């Protein structure tokens, strides 16, 4: 069975770049959300195996969305992906339930 991955970023070019990279590596069940509120809604609908989510977004930021997702599913696999690489931000994300943290830009 294919793994379902939810990509969450308000920047369409970033979602496309990650989606293209994952597609080239055999992932086919890829879904997109444009902000944290959209991510929480789609998480409930899709039940993804993995969420890759930005932090700085309109309507609901990634940390708020992470907490809402973890409230729905305490075992949710959420990886934060942000340009904010300060140690304090990484620690906030991990304390909020992120499984990992990727700093942008990346190759």
Predicted regions and their residues:
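Active-site beta3 strand of CheY-like receiver
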Residues: 46-52
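Receiver (REC) domain active-site loop signature in two-component systems and cognate sites
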Residues: 57
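A Lys-centered signature of the CheY-like receiver
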Residues: 104
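Short, conserved "switch-loop" micro-motifs in signal-transduction and mechanochemical regulators
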Residues: 84-85
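Two-component/phosphorelay signaling modules centered on CheY-like receiver
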Residues: 12-31
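Acidic catalytic/metal-coordinating carboxylates
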Residues: 35-38, 61-64
């Amino acid at each position: 069975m294919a793994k379902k991955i939810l990509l969450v970023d308000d920047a369409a070019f970033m979602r496309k770049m990650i989606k293209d990279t994952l597609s080239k590596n055999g992932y086919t069940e890829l879904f997109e959300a444009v902000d944290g509120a959209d991510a929480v809604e789609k998480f409930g609908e899709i039940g993804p195996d993995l969420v890759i989510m930005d932090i700085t977004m309109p309507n609901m930021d990634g940390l708020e969305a992470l907490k809402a997702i973890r409230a729905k599913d305490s075992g949710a696999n959420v990886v934060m992906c942000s340009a904010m690489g300060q140690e304090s931000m990484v620690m906030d994300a991990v304390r909020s339930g992120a499984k990992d943290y990727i700093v942008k830009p990346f190759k």
